[in-house]
Amino acid sequence: MALTIPRSQYVATYGPTVGDKVRLGDTDLWATIEQDFLTKGDECKFGGGKSVRDGMAQSSTATRDNPNVLDFALTNVMIIDAKLGIIKADIGIRDGRIVGIGQAGNPDTMDNVTPNMIIGASTEVHNGAHLIATAGGIDTHIHWICPQQAQHAIENGITTMIGGGSGPADGTHATTCTPGKFNIERMFQACEALPVNIGFFGKGNCSMLEPLKEQVVAGALGLKIHEDWGATPAVIDAALKVADEMDVQVAIHTDTLNESGFLEDTMKAINGRVIHTFHTEGAGGGHAPDIIKAAMYPNVLPASTNPTRPFTVNTIDEHLDMLMVCHHLDKRVPEDVAFADSRIRPETIAAEDILHDMGVFSIMSSDSQAMGRVGEVVTRTWQTADKMKAQRGALGDEGNDNFRIKRYIAKYTINPAIAHGISQYVGSLEVGKLADIVLWKPQFFGVKPEFVMKKGFISFAKMGDPNASIPTPQPVFYRPMFGANAKANTESAVYFVSQASVDANIKAQYGIQKETLAVKGCRDVGKKDLVHNNATPEITVDPERYEVRVDGEHITCEPATKVPLAQRYFLF
């Protein structure tokens, strides 16, 4: 006999279901669950008097030798994912990978259990009924100035960091390049203790091919071209030739000073080949004043860095000082001041907000310690989404913000993964991918996760006083968990590298323990492949007033005076 209970009681017990709306943090973004994979009456819930017990939702007979038995079951959780949508399900994990999105439990006593999601005596369980699960974020603009960045990144839900550098040298302060085999090898060895997946860019600034190829063989997952090393047409062509031959991506910070040509010359040198453009608005660097036009090309994968996200009343003043420090400029030199002024344009920064909302800009990243904040990629993304809803209204007429939410979460999950050939491993919660999962309470969404899993094992979490009688007493702050300790850490994170370096067995050469996974398909992608963010309208920029037009229409917006996910959540 079926038992009917009020919706409010169901939600209180098992979390929201189809049609329920959930507010994300203190934003005005509302997510509505589109599909529920769970069977009503057969939900799995752990605890005293609950269903995950021997002979009930837990199998009495299934051993781990059975490949359908889970290592970890995350039950009744709301999922927000660029590929899966906004759904309710159990997540099944085995051997560090997601093996099922569906109904976990005991098929001997329950209906509709997903075949490979059996809960047994070897299964850990976590109640996700009032939590949101997202894929671990991917930051593709890391200046490896200090190793402590990794902890700040994972505390905001970033689990993969791609960039370059070798510590606080001037070259790393300004450019995301790890130059040459010696530095690449040392960085792999140095990052063994970091709890995140990592990939390194080699220095792409060379007009001859062999010095570039040797860096890819040494383990670089891609090449980075930066104007401070000279972003000339010859350099661009050489880097792309190597990338095409060795299946890696090229990222570029173009020529702000237009020393060796203008945007049109850079696009001619690129010659239709796929490329990932950093801070495509231009405040972080790039052809002044019209680098933003690069976002209209089908072979360009355009990204933002977070200091301009979103456009606020403080954005312009902050950028001038940041720029002088990061690019080794001198306020006493008029040419240096003019260089800085040419990059900071309110008109193009305002347009950047709208281009993100239109799905023209596709990727968010940090520019860590080099005009960007490594621990704010996720937060700044949702602040931008909220600002655009306030200024531009709803996207579509669904009565919720689901499409906008999926568009924005794609910017720091699946789209950077596609851009760098790692979407078969990370970027979404699809079956078969690494179980890099971030769990949020809805009221803290986008700001402070509850905990972060790496390859199916809890790596970082909000944790109270370790000497307390329960886990929750103050002071509560982020602490590394067992997944970030000792050998578990090297088993829970990976290095993304070139196939050439896997073939060269750099893991043995360098004596590193983390798994090395080869990037694939970097040269076969285009803007059309980027999820929910693949628009290619015509973009023009007035060279004197810097006004940006999209298909002939002037786009602009006012700077925000207040943003969500800000001082309400932080003491400082």
UniProtKB/Swiss-Prot annotation:
Ni(2+) 1 binds at residues 141, 143, 224, 367. Belongs to the metallo-dependent hydrolases superfamily. Urease alpha subunit family. It comes from the Bacteria. Its EC number is 3.5.1.5. It comes from Actinobacillus pleuropneumoniae serotype 7 (strain AP76). Carboxylation allows a single lysine to coordinate two nickel ions. GO terms for cellular component: cytoplasm. The keyword Cytoplasm applies. The gene is ureC. PROSITE patterns: UREASE_1, UREASE_2, UREASE_3. One of its GO terms (biological process) is urea catabolic process. Pfam families: Amidohydro_1, Urease_alpha. Residues 136-572 form the Urease domain. The modification N6-carboxylysine is found at residue 224. It is found in: Cytoplasm. Its main location: cytoplasm. The active site is at residue 327. Its cofactor is Ni cation. Heterotrimer of UreA (gamma), UreB (beta) and UreC (alpha) subunits. Three heterotrimers associate to form the active enzyme. Substrate binds at residue 226. This is Urease subunit alpha. GO terms for molecular function: nickel cation binding; urease activity. Pathway: Nitrogen metabolism; urea degradation; CO(2) and NH(3) from urea (urease route): step 1/1.
